[in-house]
Regions:
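Short connector loops at helix/strand junctions that flank enzyme active sites
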Residues: 45-47, 69-72
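Core segments of cupin and vicinal oxygen chelate
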Residues: 10-50, 54-55
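Exposed loop/turn and edge beta-strand positions of beta-sandwich/beta-sheet ligand-binding modules
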Residues: 3, 37, 71, 115
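Hydrophobic side chains in well-ordered alpha-helices
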Residues: 17-20, 85-89
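A short local loop/turn or secondary-structure capping micro-motif enriched for an aromatic residue
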Residues: 58-62, 137-140
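N-terminal beta-strand motif that seeds the catalytic metal site of vicinal oxygen chelate
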Residues: 1-16, 72-79, 132-142
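Vicinal oxygen chelate
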Residues: 86-142
Length: 142
């Protein structure tokens, strides 16, 4: 079975975006890129690599993003303490997406029927962030 090991996020501010993921989730910087095609950072939690890139080459960017965009919708992070993560997210200007969380009956604990609930936040560059203490279906709860 294939395993997810890499996610790339396009941004106009790679330093700011990388700082967000390092400060809030403790990801480590494992590399940098600066070329004619892109500049940015590679971050990791030891299991997955997240590329934070500002593309300089229109060919590499691919299709222009618009309302029909299909791509990364959100990234989920399993955290040890959802309340502590909430504090860090708010300090980094990432706030809960109240309408979505309300619709999903999301809160700081498990949802209806004991099922896991992820809290959604507005992350940098329009990428929605999920946090969960219990993980997701198909992942092991720590």
């Amino acid at each position: 079975m294939g395993k997810i090991k890499h996610i790339a996020i396009a941004t106009q501010e790679p330093e700011k975006t990388a700082k967000f993921y390092k400060d809030v989730f403790g990801l480590e910087e494992v590399g940098q890129v600066s070329s004619d095609n892109a500049e940015g950072f590679y971050l990791s939690d030891g299991n997955i690599n997240i590329a934070i890139l500002r593309f300089k080459n229109e060919i590499l960017v691919g299709e222009k993003f618009d309302t029909n965009y299909s791509g990364i919708h959100h990234i989920g992070f399993q955290v040890d303490d959802a309340e502590a993560a909430d504090v860090k997210l708010r300090k980094a200007d990432a706030f809960p997406m109240e309408e979505i969380n309300s619709t999903l009956h999301a809160g700081m604990s498990r949802g209806r029927g004991g099922k896991n609930v992820e809290l959604k936040y507005n992350g940098p560059d329009g990428v929605m962030i999920d946090i969960s203490q219990t993980g997701w279906v198909g992942t092991e709860e720590e």
